[in-house]
Swiss-Prot record:
Pfam families tied to this protein: Bombinin (PF05298)
InterPro entries, alphabetized: Bombinin
UniProt KW keywords: Amidation, Amphibian defense peptide, Antibiotic, Antimicrobial, Cleavage on pair of basic residues, Cytolysis, Fungicide, Hemolysis, Secreted, Signal
Protein name: Maximins 5/H4 type 2
Signal sequence coordinates: 1-18
Keyword Secreted found: yes
Organism lineage string: Eukaryota, Metazoa, Chordata, Craniata, Vertebrata
Keyword Nuclease attributed: no
Tissue specificity of this protein: Expressed by the skin glands.
GO BP, one annotated term: killing of cells of another organism
Organism field: Bombina maxima (Giant fire-bellied toad)
Similarity remark: Belongs to the bombinin family.
Length: 145
């Protein structure tokens, strides 16, 4: 009789332990699902913000380029400005698909060039933008003064 009770109690303990392990696994999987959903929400918010910033910069760059080109410039200067604007637009478009852009840009490069690629890209984006903004602000100050 005692043996039956020991087996029954052991069986109850084992089944309770199995249920607690199963509940722990379910709560962990639910937590993982919630974390994944929150990460998706954060990514979508980040993508929307990035899209808005990208749209703003594209519009601002086009406006700056049209203002700059309407001033009296030589054809060579206008061509150079348009080339820079196209490069900046390509860089902004590559923000949507960074893996594809980096694959295209790094084909045939050696390791040193790959290491310096990001600093060159930052300079290529920021250099023309800052110079254009400075030029426009300088022109506005001259017109106001």
């Amino acid at each position: 009789m005692n043996f039956k009770y020991i087996v029954a109690v052991s069986f109850l303990i084992a089944s309770a332990y199995a249920r607690s392990v199963q509940n722990d696994e379910q709560s962990l999987s639910q937590r993982d699902v919630l974390e994944e959903e929150s990460l998706r929400e954060i990514r979508s918010i980040g993508a929307k913000i990035l899209g808005g910033v990208k749209t703003f910069f594209k519009g601002a760059l086009k406006e700056l380029a049209s203002t700059y080109l309407q001033q009296k410039r030589t054809a060579e200067e206008q061509h150079e400005v348009m080339k820079r604007l196209e490069a900046v637009m390509r860089d902004l478009d590559s923000l949507d698909h960074p893996e594809e852009a980096s694959e295209r840009e790094t084909r045939g490069f050696n390791q040193e060039e790959i290491a310096n690629l990001f600093t060159k890209k930052e300079k290529r984006i920021l250099g023309p933008v800052i110079s254009k903004i400075g030029g426009v602000l300088g022109g506005l100050l001259k017109n106001l003064g």
